[in-house]
Amino acid sequence: MFSLKMRASKDGVHVSGAERISTENKIEEIANSLIKRALFHENGTPDTINLKLEKITSEITYLKHIPIKTLISNNKETSRNISRNILRKELEVYFLKNGKDFGKIDILIDTAFEIIDKGNMRGAAVLDLDGNRLEEDTEKGVRVKNIDTSEELKSKILADSKLTDRTIDAIAIATKVLNFGFIAEICTSDNYSYNIGYVATKSGYFRIPNLKNEGEFGGRVFFIENSANIEEIFEKIEKTPVIVY
Ligand code: PML
């Protein structure tokens, strides 16, 4: 198998990026589709497209995608409350296990909201249960790399008119991080006009419309236990090749 990574920029500013894991006979087709994706991106036509092709030498991990649940909400306040409740329920388990004060759960969730609303990060922020940021570089955050979804999962998602290409990328990220040591994730899109976000826990990928308003920044936060081996987990979410099916 081969890894293909595309990065496109305009005037030195990142416009789009995507990656795929491919068999040898599909490299050409996938390389074309990645170039097309870069050329016709909503953020504008790039002036530079980098395409990197690498042979994958380590074993690929296949993961079943977490269940997709689309929720209904027509305003940001309700959406934030829904996401808070899902996160609170999950975090309570880990606060209890680690003997932590339940009163601090909402402060932790507020910290995550502040990070996603501030935006402007290429990767994700990582918070432990005390709200400490754990990334080496908090400007960049951590990147989840070497992932793809099976053709069957892509077709299944796109056959549902409510779901989008963004769901495909996001379900791959959420499934990988939840299987590699993180407790939960919250995400809003960095695309100004895309207001569907999600909260992911082991119970599901909860898609929540209006998790931000149009025109606002977006971001990603992963939650992790304080005792987790972050060096090992960060290395795995970046390097272990995963196909989500
Ligand atoms: C979805 O519609 O399921 C994806 C929501 C998150 C999008 C994040 C992004 O692509 O920027």
From Swiss-Prot:
The keyword ATP-binding applies. One of its GO terms (molecular function) is ATP binding. Pathway: Metabolic intermediate metabolism; pimeloyl-CoA biosynthesis; pimeloyl-CoA from pimelate: step 1/1. Its EC number is 6.2.1.14. It catalyses: heptanedioate + ATP + CoA = 6-carboxyhexanoyl-CoA + AMP + diphosphate. It is an enzyme of class 6 (ligase). One of its GO terms (biological process) is biotin biosynthetic process. InterPro entries: BioW. Pfam families: BioW. Keywords: ATP-binding, Biotin biosynthesis, Ligase, Magnesium, Nucleotide-binding. Its cofactor is Mg(2+). The keyword ATP-binding applies. NCBIfam families: PRK01322.1 (NF002360). Catalyzes the transformation of pimelate into pimeloyl-CoA with concomitant hydrolysis of ATP to AMP. Homodimer. Belongs to the BioW family. This is 6-carboxyhexanoate--CoA ligase.
